[in-house]
């Protein structure tokens, strides 16, 4: 499966909620879903057909997958990893996804979207525990320190993104804006993750 190349705003409209895929635009009135909160396409307003149980499960899987910017193979691999862990599979899946470096960068506020975070990581702007990491899928562990590389501390993209961030937006993260450093305190509990999705539907879908 290739990367999605059409307008990502259409994905939000299809799910009828913000997936925060477009960076700063998602936080303004320019976000298309503010004025067109219906499915894209010629018949977007008139789509009222009954959705099957499978359709509901598939829609939820697609939504979570798109939120985190993953391909189907990647997403399925994370699910298989979640199954092998102790606890509730759906919650394990979300916890794994929250540990991805691109997601942590986004949550810390160093990037306006996970997509932008991936670009910044690939361009070698971040360090984890003083080691340069250029792999967006790198899984951050409890106690890891994520910081902007010294030569990258003047990047406008990072500073513009930080303007929308509070000092302690998430209980499992801390951020020092002065040094552009963040700490991953612990793997978050599912209840703390601001994700409007039902991961149990994904478990049901993949269990068929």
Regions found by a protein language model. Give the residues of each.
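Beta-rich strand-turn-strand
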Residues: 111-114
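Glycine- and Gly-Pro-enriched alpha-helical subdomains that act as flexible
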Residues: 124-134
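Ferredoxin-like alpha/beta domains used as RNA- or RNAP-binding modules
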Residues: 1-108, 135-208
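Glutamine-centric residue-chemistry signal
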Residues: 24, 116-119
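Short, well-ordered loop/turn sites that connect or cap secondary structure elements
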Residues: 120-121, 140
